[in-house]
From Swiss-Prot:
It is found in: Secreted. It comes from Agrotis ipsilon (Black cutworm moth). Its main location: secreted. sNPF peptide 1: Expressed in corpora cardiaca (CC), corpora allata (CA), antennal lobe (AL) and gnathal ganglion (GNG) (at protein level). Expression in AL detected in all animals, in GNG in most animals, expression in CC and CA in some animals (at protein level). sNPF peptide 2: Expressed in corpora cardiaca (CC), corpora allata (CA), antennal lobe (AL) and gnathal ganglion (GNG) (at protein level). Expression in AL detected in all animals, in GNG, CC and CA in most animals (at protein level). Residues 22-37 have a biased composition (Basic residues). One of its GO terms (cellular component) is extracellular region. Belongs to the NPY family. The keyword Secreted applies. The modification Phenylalanine amide is found at F36, F70, F105. One of its GO terms (biological process) is neuropeptide signaling pathway. Keywords: Amidation, Cleavage on pair of basic residues, Neuropeptide, Secreted. Residues 1-48 are annotated as: Disordered. This is Short neuropeptide F. Residues 1-23, 40-62, 74-96, 109-139 form a propeptide.
Length: 139
């Protein structure tokens, strides 16, 4: 007593080859057709002639300048990319180039770091008078 085997069948499809192999039409994706399509393809747009291409290239040369392309609207507010010398006077030039005193010598707390502990507590007059007395004693 053998059991009957149940077979699962695929839904009915058109069998072009008559056997178990199904013939499938290869479908090109539209992106490939647009990129690599042939001239005989009716879906392809016609190619632009050379004179139209030259016209398009000449239009590209007359584009907006770079300084106006990136959000700058008025020319009076526009800063030139390369600063000529007439824009900067000598005083402004010196002020721009001179480093600040803090960058040269550090903050006041940094300078006090090298003093002895009792020197920082003394007033300025005492320090000055003390140095004068030391000079007199040496003579």
């Amino acid at each position: 007593m053998g059991r009957a085997r149940r077979t699962v069948r695929a839904p009915a499809q058109h069998d072009a080859l008559g056997g178990h192999a199904l013939a499938r039409k290869s479908v090109r994706s539209p992106s490939r057709r647009l990129r690599f399509g042939r001239r005989s393809d009716p879906d392809m747009p016609p190619q632009a002639p050379l004179d139209e291409m030259n016209e398009l290239l000449s239009l590209r040369e007359v584009r907006t300048p770079v300084r106006l392309r990136f959000g700058r609207r008025s020319e009076e507010r526009a800063v030139p990319h390369i600063f000529p010398q007439e824009f900067l006077t000598q005083e402004q030039d010196r002020a721009v180039r001179a480093p600040s005193i803090r960058l040269r010598f550090g903050r006041r707390s940094d300078n006090n770091m090298f003093l002895l502990p009792y020197e920082s507590a003394l007033p300025q007059e005492v320090k000055a008078n003390g140095s004068v007395e030391d000079d007199r004693q040496q003579e």
